[in-house]
From Swiss-Prot:
It catalyses: N(6)-biotinyl-L-lysyl-[protein] + hydrogencarbonate + ATP = N(6)-carboxybiotinyl-L-lysyl-[protein] + ADP + phosphate + H(+). Hydrogencarbonate binds at K238, R292, V295, R338. It comes from Escherichia coli (strain K12). Mn(2+) 1 binds at E276, E288. This is Biotin carboxylase. The keyword Ligase applies. GO terms for biological process: fatty acid biosynthetic process; malonyl-CoA biosynthetic process; negative regulation of fatty acid biosynthetic process. Biotin binds at R338. This protein is a component of the acetyl coenzyme A carboxylase complex; first, biotin carboxylase catalyzes the carboxylation of the carrier protein and then the transcarboxylase transfers the carboxyl group to form malonyl-CoA. The lineage of its organism: Bacteria, Pseudomonadati, Pseudomonadota, Gammaproteobacteria, Enterobacterales.
Length: 449
């Protein structure tokens, strides 16, 4: 097993990684910015290293500082968590080149799956169903581009190859706006991702977001751990996640899961990963793969009993998968609500000092967070301050537990989205299950005209 690792992240995921390390007897090094010296995992870690000032660019995105921290503390591996450098192939490469283990896939795998065009090509080759599209980047010949759009059928969506998180995409409903949409997406992509390659896909009007969790050891073994539904979104950011996804039959789960596991073996995948799909009219369409642990991983842990972070650590230590596919069983249902420090009306971040705090509890309730009374939420980072996960023997029980837990949760001193989460849990259509990715924005009156 790994002797000592650097946790190259902050907030709740850093604490989650620290807990898994402690259970496995792994020593921990918490790297932090000057604004984060009071974070819970920093206070609990075996060693701490301040890697720079508050802005992420100078701390959590500062590759030389993170690698130096590993060197001076004698760590053997670096866990990137999610966000920040977790899907940065150059970081993974530099970590390995410096003699450390990157807890995640190989750099070339991150590169392959990070570029949407090469990722789609690899998935098609592996037999994973994809959205009908341009099968490669779009050129400058508008006659050819119009022909592609005609073959796919309007509406289509123009996407940046290096994009993600809802950035660098445009819906086109007819020939008249095609040329302008392509050039605008190109310009945006060049500015945001330094890569102006764009491609075209069929635009699905009312899909759900369903994703498959996978684990692969890079030694020819890969398993899928059922699916999650993350359709409750605002501005392409997930708000509520659940597992399993309502209405997905065991046959459908096996069909798509086996293809994802096979794809992992085909591309030599190592670690935890997630295949994201749009799901419409009983069909799955691959959109992207996240080559890291995800925010919503706890709902999968609750229904399968598999500790995904511990599995990541074991795989990084060179161990084969500790579970076989036939040992993965789905039991019950889990729902996760992301708790954000934000104004419930404007959705603007609401940093500040937490004056009073009480975490919910009870059977089937899990609270993943780094906050405490007296903790100051800094203005420099993502607004998520916690995740509330509730488990039940079925979906109705999980939702009922979540309603109670949300009402028990007290966070005073800052504004949060707890009331919004209560509204979602009480929403009839959500309770029925199967709402699409546009539902929450329509409910909030935010749908762009």
């Amino acid at each position: 097993m790994l002797d000592k690792i650097v946790i190259a992240n902050r907030g709740e995921i850093a604490l989650r990684i620290l807990r898994a390390c402690k259970e496995l007897g792994i020593k921990t090094v918490a790297v932090h910015s000057s604004a984060d010296r009071d974070l819970k995992h920093v206070l609990l870690a075996d060693e701490t290293v301040c890697i720079g000032p508050a802005p992420s660019v100078k701390s959590y995105l500062n590759i030389p500082a993170i690698i130096s921290a590993a060197e001076i503390t004698g760590a053997v591996a670096i866990h990137p968590g999610y966000g920040f450098l977790s899907e940065n192939a150059n970081f993974a490469e530099q970590v390995e080149r410096s003699g450390f283990i990157f807890i995640g896939p190989k750099a070339e795998t991150i590169r392959l799956m990070g570029d949407k065009v090469s990722a789609i090509a690899a998935m098609k080759k592996a037999g994973v169903p994809c959205v009908p599209g341009s099968d490669g980047p779009l050129g400058d010949d508008m006659d050819k581009n119009r022909a592609i759009a005609k073959r796919i059928g309007y509406p289509v969506i123009i996407k940046a190859s290096g994009g993600g998180g809802g950035r660098g995409m445009r819906v086109v409903r007819g020939d008249a706006e095609l040329a302008q949409s392509i050039s605008m997406t190109r310009a945006e992509a060049k500015a945001a991702f330094s890569n102006d390659m764009v491609y075209m896909e069929k635009y699905l009007e009312n899909p759900r977001h369903v994703e498959i969790q996978v684990l692969a050891d890079g030694q020819g073994n890969a398993i899928y751990l059922a699916e999650r539904d993350c359709s409750m979104q605002r501005r392409h950011q997930k708000v509520v996640e659940e597992a399993p996804a309502p209405g997905i039959t065991p046959e459908l789960r096996r069909y798509i899961g086996e293809r994802c596991a096979k794809a992992c073996v085909d591309i030599g995948y190592r670690g935890a990963g997630t295949f994201e799909f749009l799901f419409e009219n009983g069909e799955f369409y691959f959109i992207e793969m996240n080559t890291r642990i995800q925010v919503e991983h706890p709902v999968t842990e609750m229904i399968t009993g598999v500790d995904l972070i511990k599995e990541q650590l074991r795989i990084a230590a060179g161990q084969p998968l500790s579970i076989k596919q036939e040992e993965v069983h789905v039991r019950g249902h889990a729902v996760e609500c992301r708790i954000n420090a934000e104004d419930p009306n404007t959705f603007l971040p609401s940093p500040g000092k937490i004056t009073r705090f009480h975490a919910p509890g009870g059977f089937g309730v899990r609270w993943e967070s780094h906050i405490y009374a007296g903790y100051t939420v800094p203005p420099y980072y993502d607004s998520m301050i916690g995740k509330l996960i509730c488990y039940g023997e079925n979906r109705d029980v999980a939702i009922a537990r979540m309603k109670n837990a949300l009402q028990e949760l007290i966070i005073d001193g800052i504004k949060t989205n707890v009331d919004l989460q209560i509204r979602i849990m009480n929403d009839e259509n959500f309770q029925h299950g199967g709402t699409n990715i546009h539902y929450l924005e329509k409910k909030l009156g935010l749908q762009e005209k």
